[in-house]
C-alpha cells in the first residue's frame, strides 16, 4: 500500500467539532442512537446512509460473527481529602506491587511524595493512603493502600464502596445512573477504567434480534486503561508508541473465528477495543489468531493490513486520537474525515455517549482487508 506522507502526521487527523455535538447523556433505548452506514467502495455518492443502530441488523448476515469486549468498568475514581486541607481525585489504574497502585491524580501538582490522603464515605471509617512517588512515564502517582487492599479482588471491594465510575472529562456531569448506563449489557470481567463505548449501543432486544437472524457472538476481554486518557503527542506517527492494555483472547474465541471462516461468514468487531484484542492476539501468533493473555501495545494506523477483523461498529472518536488512526487504517484518512464532516453536517452526537458508525467489510480498503 502506497501511503500519502500526510498519513504519517498527527496534525492530519484533526477536524473541527462544535462542543455542542459532544453527547452529555446517553439515548434511550440504547439501540435508538443514530448510525452512519459507510457505503461500500465503488458506489456512487453519497458516501454514507443514515439510520439507527436498531437497523444495523439489516446489514448483517446469518453466519456472521460479532466479537464483543466483555470488560466491566471499575468504580475507579476516588475522592480523597489531603492531610494539608483540600480535596483531590485519584483514578486507580494498575498495581505496582506490595499494596501500591498507579493512579492519575488531580490536582497532580498538589500530590507530592510523602503526602497522606484520606478516603472517606458516610458511615465508613476513613482509610489512610500515602503518595509514594511520581511516575514519570504516565505522569501519575504511585499510592500506597492499606495492606489488606493489596490485590485486585480486595481493591475492587474498596472501589465498589468508595468509588465512582470514571466518566471521560468531556462529559460535564455526573449522575448515579451512569453506574449502569456506562456499562455494556454484557460487561462481566471487571478491570477497565473506561467503557468499550461501541458496545453501549447493544440493547438486550437488539442482541436477541441478531441471534434470531443467525448472527453468532463471542467475547474477548480488553481492559481499557491509561491509553484512553492520554492524547497522542507524537507528530511523526512512524514513532508512535501506545500504553499497553491487558487482553485475553480465549480458546473459544479462536474456535468461533475459525468456524466463521469455514462457513464464509464475516468477523465483525464491536468497537476498537475488540479490534485491538483480536489483532494483538494474531500478532502474537505470527499473523494467525491464537489464544492469548497479556499486554498489547499494538499501533494500528494507515498501512496496516488486518489479520482477523472484516468489519467494524464504532463510535465517533476524538481528533488526533489513536482510535481515529485505527479507523483510518480501515477506510483511509481522507475518506474518514469526509465521513466525519457528513456526520457533523447531519447533527450526529460524538464520543462515548454519542452515535455510531458501521463500516461494512465491502467499505474497507482492499489493501487493509484480511488475506
Swiss-Prot record:
Gene: queA
PANTHER family membership: S-ADENOSYLMETHIONINE:TRNA RIBOSYLTRANSFERASE-ISOMERASE
Cell compartment(s), UniProt: Cytoplasm
InterPro entries registered for this protein in UniProt: QueA, QueA_dom1, QueA_dom2, QueA_sf
Family recorded in the similarity comment: Belongs to the QueA family.
Protein keywords: Cytoplasm, Queuosine biosynthesis, S-adenosyl-L-methionine, Transferase
Protein name: S-adenosylmethionine:tRNA ribosyltransferase-isomerase
Xref: NCBIfam families: PRK00147.1, queA
EC number: 2.4.99.17
Assembly with partners or alone: Monomer.
Amino acid at each position: 500500500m502506497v501511503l500519502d506522507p500526510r498519513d504519517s502526521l498527527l496534525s492530519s487527523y484533526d477536524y473541527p467539532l462544535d462542543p455542542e455535538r459532544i453527547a452529555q447523556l446517553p439515548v434511550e433505548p440504547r439501540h435508538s442512537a443514530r448510525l452512519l452506514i459507510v457505503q461500500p467502495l465503488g458506489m456512487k455518492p453519497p458516501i454514507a446512509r443514515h439510520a439507527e443502530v436498531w437497523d444495523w441488523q439489516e446489514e448483517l448476515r446469518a453466519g456472521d460473527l460479532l466479537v464483543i469486549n466483555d470488560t466491566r468498568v471499575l468504580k475507579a475514581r476516588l475522592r480523597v481529602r489531603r492531610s494539608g486541607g483540600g480535596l483531590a481525585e485519584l483514578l486507580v489504574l494498575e498495581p505496582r506491587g506490595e499494596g501500591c497502585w498507579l493512579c492519575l491524580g488531580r490536582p497532580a501538582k498538589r500530590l507530592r511524595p510523602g503526602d497522606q490522603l484520606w478516603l472517606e464515605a458516610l458511615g465508613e471509617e476513613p482509610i489512610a493512603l500515602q503518595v509514594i512517588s511520581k511516575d514519570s512515564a504516565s505522569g501519575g502517582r504511585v499510592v500506597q493502600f492499606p495492606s489488606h487492599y493489596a490485590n485486585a479482588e480486595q481493591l475492587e471491594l474498596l472501589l465498589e464502596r468508595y468509588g465512582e465510575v470514571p466518566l471521560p472529562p468531556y462529559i460535564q456531569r455526573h449522575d448515579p445512573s451512569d453506574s449502569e448506563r456506562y456499562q455494556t449489557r454484557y460487561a462481566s470481567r471487571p478491570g477497565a477504567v473506561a467503557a468499550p463505548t461501541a458496545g453501549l449501543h447493544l440493547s438486550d432486544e437488539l442482541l436477541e434480534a441478531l441471534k434470531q437472524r443467525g448472527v453468532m457472538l463471542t467475547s474477548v476481554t480488553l481492559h481499557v486503561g491509561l491509553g484512553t486518557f492520554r492524547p497522542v503527542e507524537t507528530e511523526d506517527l512512524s514513532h508512535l508508541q501506545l500504553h499497553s492494555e491487558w487482553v485475553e483472547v480465549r480458546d473459544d474465541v479462536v474456535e468461533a473465528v475459525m468456524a466463521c471462516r469455514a462457513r464464509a461468514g464475516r468477523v465483525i468487531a464491536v468497537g476498537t477495543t475488540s479490534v485491538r484484542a483480536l489483532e494483538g492476539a494474531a500478532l502474537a501468533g505470527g499473523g494467525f489468531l491464537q489464544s492469548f493473555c497479556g499486554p498489547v501495545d499494538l499501533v494500528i494506523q494507515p498501512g496496516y493490513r488486518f489479520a482477523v477483523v472484516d468489519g467494524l461498529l464504532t463510535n465517533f472518536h476524538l481528533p488526533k486520537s489513536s482510535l481515529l488512526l485505527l479507523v483510518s487504517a480501515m477506510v483511509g484518512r481522507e475518506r474518514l474525515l469526509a465521513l466525519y464532516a457528513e456526520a457533523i453536517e447531519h447533527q450526529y452526537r460524538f464520543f462515548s455517549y454519542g452515535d455510531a458508525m458501521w463500516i461494512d467489510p465491502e467499505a474497507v480498503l482492499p489493501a487493509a482487508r484480511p488475506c
